[in-house]
């Protein structure tokens, strides 16, 4: 019997408490000049909301996203006319800006559209539940095995020309399952479940593999975080069992807007990334697409997967705080937010400050009323009046050769 005096001797597996995220090993998939998977940095994506028939507005929207860090841009393609416009969009980007990796989003009965866009873009996204759309029958209550397989054969015949086209051009495809648009036969067979989502994706993957096409990225999105988490985890389990090391595109679809939309997306995307699952992400907000990009990079930075901005460490303030912490943090952030690769700590007092900011490159710590101490790592460099604190912090960073002008 285990007691406090006689604790268990079972050895602790230190790997369980490793502070490094060990990412799932996946194959590399090229999308234009960006690589998804294969150990490359997690890629940030978004989607424009312009009508792609409007060439000028679409080019401007793609450029706005790319300039703020969106590495792959998706566009919707509801018709053949839209598909043909993508060639002109891609050409105008190259002439007036630079090439940007583009993904075409294809849905209902999209074979002809997909074949056209495959000539124009770097990746095609298809939705297995809608690519070969079977109109629901109100009187149906089941699918026989023969009926299930018959539709499977139709899917293969419809998908094959696109797979061959992308394979021969060495372009990519995303098999993008949505919880809200599973096909009727998957719903009858597996229910409205993560299992149904996974089986829907696997059916399309197996068709691609049978045609020796492997440039695949997989997604299983849902608007409810628990469903999304379960689907991705089950997908990883099944792919590992089947030897399918395909990269995963993470997202919570229809997350909404504001704080809750950001929290909801972070709960889903961040949880999986922390488990080593995920190679590219999109935060879907009911806001301007440009507002999605900072959320993506913040998630990646918080998990230590990509460092693209200053990491600020700051205490929540308490009765020991010797200056207006909120105002000072704002001043420090405004002065240094253009820098990259630095950790800067702003701490209210010396009780916990030096210890809790030990990993920071620079520290700004309340010393006594009216004065603060500046640190380089663990070393206290100088004590200055708080009115000079931000200016002297900048001077310290400059002295170390780590400052760049905004």
Curated annotation (Swiss-Prot):
The lineage of its organism: Bacteria, Bacillati, Cyanobacteriota, Cyanophyceae, Oscillatoriophycideae. Belongs to the IspG family. GO terms for biological process: isopentenyl diphosphate biosynthetic process, methylerythritol 4-phosphate pathway; terpenoid biosynthetic process. PANTHER family: 4-HYDROXY-3-METHYLBUT-2-EN-1-YL DIPHOSPHATE SYNTHASE, 4-HYDROXY-3-METHYLBUT-2-EN-1-YL DIPHOSPHATE SYNTHASE (FERREDOXIN), CHLOROPLASTIC. It comes from the Bacteria. It comes from Trichodesmium erythraeum (strain IMS101). Binds 1 [4Fe-4S] cluster. [4Fe-4S] cluster binds at residues 315, 318, 349, 356. Keywords: 4Fe-4S, Iron, Iron-sulfur, Isoprene biosynthesis, Metal-binding, Oxidoreductase. Its cofactor is [4Fe-4S] cluster. This is 4-hydroxy-3-methylbut-2-en-1-yl diphosphate synthase (ferredoxin). Its EC number is 1.17.7.1. Pfam families: GcpE (PF04551).
């Amino acid at each position: 019997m285990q007691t406090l005096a006689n604790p268990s001797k079972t050895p602790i597996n230190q790997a369980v408490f490793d502070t490094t995220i060990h990412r799932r090993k996946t194959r590399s998939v090229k999308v234009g000049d960006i690589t998804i998977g294969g150990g490359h940095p997690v890629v940030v994506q978004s989607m424009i909301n312009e009508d792609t028939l409007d060439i000028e507005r679409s080019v401007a929207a793609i450029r706005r996203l790319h300039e703020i860090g969106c590495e792959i841009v998706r566009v919707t393609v509801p018709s053949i006319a839209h598909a043909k416009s993508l060639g002109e969009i891609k050409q105008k980007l190259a002439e007036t800006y630079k090439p940007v990796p583009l993904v075409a989003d294809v849905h209902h009965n999209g074979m002809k559209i997909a074949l056209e866009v495959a000539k124009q873009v770097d990746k095609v996204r298809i939705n297995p539940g809608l690519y070969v759309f079977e109109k629901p029958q109100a009187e149906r209550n089941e699918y026989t095995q023969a009926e299930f397989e018959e539709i499977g054969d139709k899917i293969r015949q419809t998908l094959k020309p696109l797979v061959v086209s992308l394979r021969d051009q060495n372009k990519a495809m995303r098999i993008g399952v949505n919880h809200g648009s599973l096909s009727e036969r998957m719903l009858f067979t597996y229910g409205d479940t993560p299992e149904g989502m996974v089986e829907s994706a696997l059916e399309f993957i197996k068709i691609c593999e049978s045609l020796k096409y492997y440039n695949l990225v997989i997604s299983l999105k849902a608007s409810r975080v628990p469903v999304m988490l379960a689907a991705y985890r089950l997908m990883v389990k099944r792919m590992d069992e089947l030897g399918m090391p395909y990269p995963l595109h993470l997202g919570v679809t229809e997350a909404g807007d504001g704080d809750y939309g950001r929290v909801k997306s972070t709960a889903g995307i961040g949880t999986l990334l922390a488990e080593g699952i995920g190679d590219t992400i999109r935060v879907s907000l009911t806001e301007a697409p440009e507002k999605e990009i900072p959320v993506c990079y913040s998630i990646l930075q918080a998990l230590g997967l990509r460092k693209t901005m200053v990491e600020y460490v700051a205490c929540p303030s308490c009765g020991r705080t010797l200056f207006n912490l909120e105002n000072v943090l704002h001043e420090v952030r405004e002065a240094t937010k253009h820098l990259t690769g630095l950790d800067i700590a702003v701490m209210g007092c010396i009780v916990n400050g030096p210890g809790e900011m030990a990993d920071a490159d620079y520290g700004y710590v309340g010393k006594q009323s009216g004065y603060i101490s500046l640190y380089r790592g663990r070393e206290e460099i100088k004590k200055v009046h708080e009115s000079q604190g931000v200016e002297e912090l900048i001077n310290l960073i400059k002295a170390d050769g780590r400052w760049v002008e905004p």
